[in-house]
Regions:
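N-terminal Rossmann-like NAD(P)+-binding domain of SDR-like oxidoreductases, especially those catalyzing
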Residues: 1-112, 132
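Short glycine-/acidic-enriched loop or helix-start segments at secondary-structure transitions
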Residues: 18-19, 59-61, 116, 150, ...
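C-terminal substrate-binding subdomain of Rossmann-fold SDR/epimerase-dehydratase oxidoreductases
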Residues: 36, 111, 132-241
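Acidic pyrophosphate-coordinating catalytic loop
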Residues: 117-118, 212
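Amphipathic alpha-helical segments in well-structured domains
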Residues: 34, 125-126
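Conserved donor sugar-nucleotide recognition element shared by glycan-biosynthetic enzymes
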Residues: 81, 89, 121, 185, ...
């Protein structure tokens, strides 16, 4: 009997402040990490899931984003260590599937939040909540009209589990796992202020380079292949958790 039957390759910093701190290590984590997990899967004949990202779509020109969209991403920018590392990992997974017959699963994860997030994580949900609870200024980068789709962690986990257990071995994905309800960053800030009762003011800072202007998953394929999967926890309810 195999020592390992299923592998979930989840390792990589996903917050821009972390992955840009050491971009070489970030790329190595995605690429070498994928090779290590694929080698283990081949040795054990195990099924292996790659936690990819909506960042492979870059600053998309197609909206919402479907899995067959190749993306609009800057391969030389500050974010590319993360984006290109994940794209390379997807390529490695498909190469192992074609060459060695390893049952691989690729999911592209959209913005996810939940309890126990690091207060210094640097991503927008944790930033806004921490700032609001401290009555510090809420920092919006750019005009606040850029959009994101926020997914509660429980919905993500359910989607990944279904990808591993409810799809045939010859179905590799990729599959978008995300909440298709879209909010502007300004809307998110006002929701956080309302839910926390904070007296924080909103301030605006320059938008970082290559920051996507819109992000929203098309989850048609997930609904079809993952047993009618769709997010069940909406933004306000998730933020209260």
């Amino acid at each position: 009997m195999a020592e390992v039957e299923e592998i979930y390759n989840l390792a990589c910093p996903a917050s821009p402040i972390y992955y840009q701190h050491d971009p070489i290590k970030t790329t190595q984590t995605s690429v070498i990490g994928a090779m290590n997990m694929l080698g283990m899967a081949r040795y054990n004949r195990a099924k292996v899931l790659q936690a990819s990202t909506s960042e492979v779509y870059g600053d998309p020109l197609v909206h919402p984003q479907t899995e067959d969209y190749w993306g609009h991403e800057n391969p030389l920018g500050l974010r590319s260590c993360y984006d290109e590392g994940k794209r390379c990992a997807e390529s490695l997974f498909m190469s192992y599937y074609r060459e060695h017959g390893i049952p691989v699963k690729i999911v592209r994860i959209f913005n996810t939040y939940g309890p126990k997030m690091d207060i210094n994580d640097g991503r927008v949900v944790s930033n806004f909540i921490v700032q609001a609870l401290r009555n510090e200024p809420i920092t919006i980068y750019g005009d606040g009209e850029q959009t994101r789709s926020f997914q509660y962690i429980d919905d993500l986990i359910e989607g990944m589990l279904r990808m591993m257990t409810a799809t045939p071995d010859d179905f590799t994905g990729p599959v978008n796992i995300g909440n298709p309800n879209e909010f502007t960053i300004s809307e998110l800030a006002h929701i956080v202020l309302e839910l926390t009762g904070s007296k924080s003011k909103i301030i605006r800072m320059p938008l970082p380079s290559d920051d996507p202007q819109q992000r929203k998953p098309d989850i048609t394929l997930a609904h079809k292949m993952l047993g009618d999967w769709e997010p069940t926890i909406q933004l306000r309810d998730g933020l209260l958790k």
